[in-house]
Amino acid sequence: VGSRKPVVAYGDTLEGDLTRRDFTINAMALRLPDLELVDPCGGLDDLRAGVLRTPVSAVQSFDDDPLRMMRAARFSAQLGFDVEMDVMNAMTRMALRPEIVSVERVRAELERLLVSPWPRRGLELLVHTGLADVVLPELAALRETVDEHHRHKDVYEHTLTVLDQAMGLETGADGPVPAPDLVLRLAAIMHDIGKPATRRFLPGGTVTFHGHDHVGARMTRKRLRALRFDKQTIKDVSRL
């Protein structure tokens, strides 16, 4: 039976403790007082290579705490690191496991991902592995919807481009839109989620999405409430 707050067991030695960490880049320590680097899993090499790898098998690591899959996407967005293929395969295989994790923990990781320097990387990883089907199913659904008014293969690609453009509007800390702006970035990825539900085909092959903005606003409020965002954030994002 999965716990909503998994308890990770630790080893009897420093090395044993490190092997139970989430990723090798976090599985290093300095032994005092000599400041000797303890790196049983090759974390320093992975740090230099920009690779996210688990100290033990990815399946075992994610079974210990399924939130680590969200953390992989967040670190990819924060650090610009690549995810090792075994890790990505395990994320795909276990994509539904975050359902047993508390909503608050999932939301916290999603927030960290979105305010990272490269949120597009993290979102693409969530969608590619199927994790978005649990966390942001409305985003994943956009892959199946084509909007002929935009120069993208689907609304999903258009949405990620809008996210990039929204980040370009952010300013320094003393400007009108201090970066990173969580509300702006959430609004960017949610702005077209009403299109799949409102898509209609007209004679001649024309596609319309009449009322998608109003439908999308309702869907946004529902999703953000489910993720337990605060009321002000929900209000601001759905208004945008």
Protein language model regions, located:
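Catalytic cores of the polymerase beta-like nucleotidyltransferase superfamily
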Residues: 1-240
